[in-house]
């Protein structure tokens, strides 16, 4: 299969020149800046290891294995198992592209052994625990001394799967109550490098109702949650304790629980990735974990074979 970005490349093309074309291909395919930077960084390291005039058709399986051995043991720069596994993924992706595009006759990376990483599974809330926490948060909301903060914080993370840093950065201006497809929260980033993480996520009717009450209770200025990160962690922990949950409820646990709920609901995997605001490379590991967590929440198997996130 020949693609436009590799059509002018042949066995005599040097590795640096081929990488320029690969960057164009990745960009045209809609890969995130994070993915492109990671993949190109790994292949530029290979280019610095090989002779500068080495042609792509001359690169062999032995060259790649020697490169990986050098990176692990001789470079004198730490290379964790997760980093090594990601770099092998980069090699396989690049040489597969060359081979499928007709630039090389054989794929030297095809038989490179992928290194697996035993990565601990995150702890998530069961559906019953989620129900108990939401019921407790509703009691806070409807009690004689109403507390809207706990309900708003927990349900926001559960509905949207946003990260702690994203939650702390939210302002009331990021809540759009009049969007054409229904109320939403706009996750924004100041840095252009992180613009690919920006996304608009829908909000439930119950959350919007609580939000109106919350704005009456708290005089909000430029932050939706005007407290420190640690204080909000305590809010989630205390909510879990009051609901009788033995696990330590955290931002990360709520984010993973949100993703597992979406996975179990059969939502398209790419939509889950976009909702979480992560790259294709990161989602390779995360999707495996979501599959395992969705299949079994018994807590008996706490590790899995997976490709690392970058």
Regions found by a protein language model. Give the residues of each.
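N-terminal core-binding DNA-recognition domain of tyrosine recombinases/integrases
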Residues: 2-5, 20-121, 140
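Catalytic-site neighborhood detector that most strongly recognizes the C-terminal catalytic loop/helix
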Residues: 124, 276-310
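Active-site/catalytic core of tyrosine-dependent DNA strand-transfer enzymes
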Residues: 202-246, 258
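Basic, Lys/Arg- and aromatic-enriched nucleic-acid-binding interface segment
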Residues: 132-160, 164
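DNA breakage-rejoining catalytic core of tyrosine-based enzymes
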Residues: 118-135, 194-205
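Short basic/aromatic active-site micro-motif
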Residues: 148-149, 246-266, 276-282
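Conserved tyrosine-mediated DNA breakage-rejoining catalytic core shared by Y-recombinases
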Residues: 169-207
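Alpha-helix N-cap/helix-start motif at helix boundaries, enriched for small hydrophobics
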Residues: 91, 153-154, 161, 165-170, ...
């Amino acid at each position: 299969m020949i693609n436009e970005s590799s059509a002018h490349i042949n066995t005599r093309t040097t590795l640096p020149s081929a990488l320029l074309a690969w960057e164009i291909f990745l960009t045209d395919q809609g890969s995130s800046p994070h993915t492109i930077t990671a993949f190109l960084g790994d292949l530029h390291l290979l280019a610095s290891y090989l002779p500068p005039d080495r042609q792509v058709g001359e690169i062999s399986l032995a060259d790649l294995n020697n490169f990986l051995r050098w990176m692990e043991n001789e470079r004198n720069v730490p290379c964790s198992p997760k980093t090594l596994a990601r770099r092998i993924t980069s090699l396989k992706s690049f040489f597969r592209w060359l081979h499928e595009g007709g630039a090389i006759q054989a794929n030297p990376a095809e038989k490179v052994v992928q290194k697996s990483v035993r990565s601990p599974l995150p702890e998530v809330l069961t559906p019953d625990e989620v129900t108990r926490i939401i019921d407790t948060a509703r009691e806070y909301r409807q009690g004689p001394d109403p507390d809207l903060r706990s309900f708003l914080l927990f349900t926001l993370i559960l509905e949207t799967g946003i990260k702690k840093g994203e939650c702390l950065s939210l302002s009331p201006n990021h809540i759009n109550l009049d969007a054409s497809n229904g109320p939403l929260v706009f996750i924004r980033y100041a840095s252009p490098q992180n613009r690919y993480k920006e996304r608009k996520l829908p909000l439930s009717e119950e959350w919007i109702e609580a939000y109106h009450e919350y704005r009456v209770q708290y005089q909000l200025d430029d932050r939706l949650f005007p407290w420190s990160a640690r204080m909000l962690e305590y809010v989630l922990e205390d909510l879990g304790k009051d609901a009788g949950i033995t696990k330590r409820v955290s931002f990360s646990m709520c984010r993973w629980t949100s993703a597992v709920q979406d996975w179990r609901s059969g939502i398209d995997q790419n939509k889950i990735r976009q909702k979480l605001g992560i790259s294709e490379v990161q989602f390779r590991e995360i999707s495996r974990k979501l599959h395992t967590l969705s299949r079994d929440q018994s807590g008996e198997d706490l590790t899995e074979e997976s490709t690392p996130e970058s």
